Amino acid sequence: MKMSRSEHSLQALSWRKLYLSRAKLKASSRTSALLSGFAMVAMVEVQLDTNHDYPPGLLIAFSACTTVLVAVHLFALMVSTCILPNIEAVSNVHNLNSVKESPHERMHRHIELAWAFSTVIGTLLFLAGVVLLCWVKFLPIKPKGQKNGTVSAGVAAAITSTSIMVPFGLVFIVFAVHFYRSLVSHKTDRQFQELEELEDLQNELDHREEVSTLQSPGSLYP
């Protein structure tokens, strides 16, 4: 059975959505596994100086940031692990109609949530964790005999890392907002194109019904 141009376009659109969902899940799983692993290693390997009096807020912030970071990435990894095999199974079948068996349409919100957690929220938490780790690591470093009024080398190193990471974090936020707005605009344009394709398909189906009605024997001999 041959497909019309509109039907073929709808099939191509469905497959494009499937491949996009699969790519997002793969990117989320790789990014989440990598960043959560780094966060866990940083928390385990950091060596606190027991002779130094750390500010309680610094330790609480570092612990909370690392824990939330791991939890966010594990959630994204869990969603990717649960949904990705079902999409992979459908994408490996060489049948155009098999795209209807994929759960990517029903699980669209979960896929977008996992992608946002992994690439946006998780990355921001990772940047914040790097800054807090620098403060925890470098704050106790202080040469012997240094006066209390001067800035120690450890504090200077922590301030330097913070001053570098904060502008980079702002640039990342601006880029994320700009990318999201561009993506929404692109999706809006695609929605209009899909509506036009559906309208063309409906007109084509109506035309087929009219032709079949005119060619039927009952229409020629009442």
UniProtKB/Swiss-Prot annotation:
Disulfide bonds, paired cysteine numbers: none
Topological domains, Cytoplasmic: 1-30, 80-112, 176-222
One Pfam family named in its UniProt record: Orai-1
Bilayer topology annotation: Multi-pass membrane protein
Main location: membrane
Keyword annotations of the record: Adaptive immunity, Calcium, Calcium channel, Calcium transport, Cell membrane, Glycoprotein, Immunity, Ion channel, Ion transport, Membrane, Transmembrane, Transmembrane helix, Transport
Extracellular side stretches: 49-58, 134-154
Membrane spanning residue stretches: 31-48, 59-79, 113-133, 155-175
GO cellular component, one term: membrane
Swiss-Prot/TrEMBL GO biological process terms: adaptive immune response; positive regulation of calcium ion transport; sarcomere organization; store-operated calcium entry
Glycosylation sites: N148
GO molecular function, one term: store-operated calcium channel activity
Record's subcellular location: Cell membrane
Role: Ca(2+) release-activated Ca(2+) (CRAC) channel subunit which mediates Ca(2+) influx following depletion of intracellular Ca(2+) stores.
Family of this protein: Belongs to the Orai family.
Name this polypeptide is given: Calcium release-activated calcium channel protein 1
UniProt source species: Danio rerio
